């Protein structure tokens, strides 16, 4: 292997890690019938003239396995927080008690569980596509480089190995999430 061409595999790995991090965020937004503070992460509240994450206007807690509470710091925002949760598409019916909003998490029926596993599969496929796009970028860099056939084969093997590792991580996370969703 000559010293002429060095592929930045750290950059490729960092970008593939980004796809995994994005997948985790998408998976966290899927309601599994189990209470989790992370399920409210995508909810944005119209507070003080700007769209603000819910955790910046109140404290999110999970006091029970099927209950999430939001203790809103500013009494004037309670209705806006309640509206944001109601309109978030999470299928949760908020109950207000002063500045505390209680979110009872209903059990999921079998049909909804199956729908959510399909959604999780779609998220995982999007992550696989993102990983493969990074792989293609790496392969394109190798093809554009003026390097020997042996060097090109070495780098292509390294990129493929990295890709396989990340695709397996996506598949493992999907399997775990689907088991979590289907668990009654």
UniProtKB/Swiss-Prot annotation:
InterPro entries: Ribosome_recyc_fac, Ribosome_recyc_fac_dom, RRF_sf
GO biological process, one term: cytoplasmic translational termination
GO cellular component terms attached to this protein's record: cytosol
Major place of residence: cytoplasm
Keywords attached to this entry: Cytoplasm, Protein biosynthesis
Location in the cell: Cytoplasm
GO MF terms held by the record: ribosomal large subunit binding
Domain of life: Bacteria
UniProt function note: Responsible for the release of ribosomes from messenger RNA at the termination of protein biosynthesis. May increase the efficiency of translation by recycling ribosomes from one round of translation to another.
Entry similarity comment: Belongs to the RRF family.
NCBIfam families: frr
This protein's name: Ribosome-recycling factor
Organism: Jannaschia sp. (strain CCS1)
Organism classification: Bacteria, Pseudomonadati, Pseudomonadota, Alphaproteobacteria, Rhodobacterales
Gene, per the UniProt record: frr
